[in-house]
């Protein structure tokens, strides 16, 4: 599941195909239609932290649907996206994590002024909602990921 501009997800799909993995791409609007054909869902992340990650808006809706239908969810990413929130000041973390609202006209051009429009492209997701995080060398359940985040970043800063 990815949007039209999700270049990273499209590249990951190409890599998985090169490893003979069968992939079927479904947009968010057709997810329920494909329920009986989905073995698992693979998502991307923009940032991975100890207890949450940043992903595309709509990810929490996908997770609710997947949980209700007993479909495992994986996050495919790499260690360059890890941000250790324990060793950085809040101001630096906020510069990576906080997102300014996007253009209201992306949702409704010429909307009446009385209408409040909220448009964000990213959202925070709790790591505990994911079955496995797949990094370059290994897959980690959420309860192990926090330790991995600490080790990877400490070694990068030394």
Residue ranges and their predicted role:
Residues 4-158:
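Conserved phosphate- and dinucleotide-binding cores of soluble alpha/beta proteins
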């Amino acid at each position: 599941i990815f949007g039209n501009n999700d270049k990273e997800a499209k590249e990951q799909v190409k890599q998985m195909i090169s490893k003979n993995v069968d992939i079927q791409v479904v947009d968010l609007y057709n997810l329920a239609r494909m329920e009986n054909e989905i073995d698992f869902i693979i998502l991307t992340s923009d940032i991975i932290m100890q207890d949450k990650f940043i992903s595309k808006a709509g990810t929490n809706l996908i997770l609710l649907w997947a949980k209700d239908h007993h479909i495992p969810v994986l996050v495919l990413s790499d260690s360059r996206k890890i941000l250790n929130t324990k060793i950085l000041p809040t101001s630096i973390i906020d510069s990576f994590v906080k997102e300014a609202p996007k253009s209201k006209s992306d949702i409704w051009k010429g909307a009446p002024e009385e209408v409040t429009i909220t448009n964000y492209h990213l959202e925070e997701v709790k790591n505990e909602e994911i079955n496995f995080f797949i990094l370059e060398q290994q897959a980690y359940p959420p309860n192990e990921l926090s330790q991995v985040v600490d080790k990877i970043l400490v070694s990068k800063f030394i």
